[in-house]
């Protein structure tokens, strides 16, 4: 081997021993005739000292520059008093170098690694192989590896089998657009890259494998946000003969053990909350419980007021009128309120009403707001009592369609929690349960809230009679307002699966065409089964404190779903297109 140790492995126990290191020159310093090189490798850094007594080695050290790849042999020695570097794992020792081989030279990097500052993300992604040399980036990928190792170990110990499922499959309606792959041997036909291994893992349960897992690549051609990538990694789990409480208990144990092993954090039992309660209190099905602010419904106090902005939604069963109290917010300037008004507009809110509570003892005179003159004093007091308002608070209001108010004030709740530093703890895991089976569209049609294979908490007949009120056997694990994973008990009877398809507007012919293999499988003794899938990238993002999942993926795509390093996607030549039976249509230019 070319090295005896990694830099991060060196410590005082090796004092006096000869070591050989291989790595990159992170920093070079010349201090009065003595040259110091900070050598960096995957595991950390070490300081190497070269003195002029060894003329040939000293001259070689004098020639090296940042990012040269070197092999160094020397003797470990303790650093002098006052020279210990507490910020470096090997900071108590240094190596007296007496042999240096330059394995490769390096041009000046496009951005400095040792004084990293405001480098644009596109530049970082263009030179990702340089960006990943930075210790903080390498630390994230090392932690990612520890996370996957911990998860694999837990699942292996609990009897799960790691089974790979196909990457080339057929398109099925799962919500997002598929990435399509043209077939050369079947002209005019296309494979689809999987959005998840959902159907294959269910078929593995039908086949009797009982406990399956896979750390799987998944693909979705969708609009990208901070927590989305066109290709992402999923921790995919499926079991037979367990109900939802048992699956939730098992996967919760996995996450608790993971945080203990990797971050030395102890979690207690995760609280459970229904979807209805989460939406009512927090305006979100993935509430951040670290923030002690809640939405409070006040429609009953505003049904008869002479103020249509409130009275209209208060009397509409599809709408919601909600208050959100911010303690100590009465001193907020109008410019800040305008900023928050613009913010909730992103979610469809037409405005943001408010009341500043200056001095409740003075009645209406002690309240500052353009809306108080439209609401009877008794109703105002009832509202302020209900939200717990005291002098110095501000109360915001939302009145609109249920979804608009929930999303707008739910997002405002999060924004206020961070802007005013209200977080009560660092970590807040939880479960959300009892999701609706379907989301009703404006035209009266239905969309599956999770996916079409989720089992309901009722019979097929009850489901078809009352689809809008049916609850599913679905469950989501949420951490700090981020959905870590979602799962459900699956449909294992053909009649129920056909009923769900019908409610989604998928008639018998289309069912057979797109899902015939699944319906066939359900005829041949499918066991009760269910599972859960975690987003690995999101999990690593949370555990490393990264701001985006792009920070925890080795080679991510940009927000426009492109790789600036490899220039993918790229054009292909005409011959390759002909073999795939594809002809590109010329785009007409708009004058």
Curated annotation (Swiss-Prot):
Its EC number(s): 6.1.1.23
GO CC term (a single one): cytoplasm
Entry's localization field: Cytoplasm
Catalytic activity annotation: tRNA(Asx) + L-aspartate + ATP = L-aspartyl-tRNA(Asx) + AMP + diphosphate
Secretion signal span: none
Main location: cytoplasm
Annotated Pfam families: GAD, tRNA-synt_2, tRNA_anti-codon
Gene Ontology molecular function: aspartate-tRNA ligase activity; aspartate-tRNA(Asn) ligase activity; ATP binding; nucleic acid binding
Residues where L-aspartate binds: 174, 220, 450, 490
GO biological process: aspartyl-tRNA aminoacylation
Amino acids binding ATP: 220-222, 229, 483, 535-538
Keyword Signal: no
Keywords, ordered alphabetically: Aminoacyl-tRNA synthetase, ATP-binding, Cytoplasm, Ligase, Nucleotide-binding, Protein biosynthesis
Highest taxon above the source species: Bacteria
Family according to the record: Belongs to the class-II aminoacyl-tRNA synthetase family. Type 1 subfamily.
Oligomer status and interactors: Homodimer.
Purpose of the protein: Aspartyl-tRNA synthetase with relaxed tRNA specificity since it is able to aspartylate not only its cognate tRNA(Asp) but also tRNA(Asn). Reaction proceeds in two steps: L-aspartate is first activated by ATP to form Asp-AMP and then transferred to the acceptor end of tRNA(Asp/Asn).
Protein name (record): Aspartate--tRNA(Asp/Asn) ligase
Provenance organism: Pseudomonas putida (strain ATCC 47054 / DSM 6125 / CFBP 8728 / NCIMB 11950 / KT2440)
Taxonomic placement: Bacteria, Pseudomonadati, Pseudomonadota, Gammaproteobacteria, Pseudomonadales
Gene, per the UniProt record: aspS
